[in-house]
């Protein structure tokens, strides 16, 4: 498995990432380890160290499912992570239960990370 920075450019130790990844809890396309969040991609795994995270929250998007006129919206839960650099990352979760759990764990592991959505100031774009 190849580990790469999810965003930005910083050195990674493949062996320590692999050890943390194998102990991490799978929550969908996101895993939470002791030191980082891991985002699954087709041919690689993105690493996002918790010390780069400023805020985390859940987002629910309605995704149309079905064919033709029988399309109905289905809610998909995402973990949204805003970084200190201003960038944002999004990873799909299995459901609300995993989302609530990961937010509690992130806060327990790194109390300086803000939890919950904060509306942007007037005139600013939402992440």
Language model segments and positions:
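A generic structural signal for short, solvent-exposed coil/turn residues
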Residues: 22-24, 29-31, 40-42, 73, ...
């Amino acid at each position: 498995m190849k580990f790469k920075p999810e965003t930005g450019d910083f050195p990674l130790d493949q062996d320590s990432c692999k050890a943390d990844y194998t102990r991490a809890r799978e929550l969908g396309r996101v895993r939470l380890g002791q030191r980082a969040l891991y985002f699954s991609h087709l041919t690689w795994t993105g690493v996002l160290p918790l010390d780069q995270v400023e805020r985390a929250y859940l987002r629910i998007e309605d995704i149309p499912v079905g064919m033709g006129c029988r399309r109905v919206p289905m809610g998909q839960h995402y973990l949204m992570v805003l970084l200190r650099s201003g960038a944002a990352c999004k990873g799909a979760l299995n459901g609300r239960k995993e989302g609530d759990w990961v937010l509690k764990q992130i806060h327990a592991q790194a109390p300086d990370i803000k939890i919950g959505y904060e509306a942007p100031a007037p005139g600013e774009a939402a992440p």
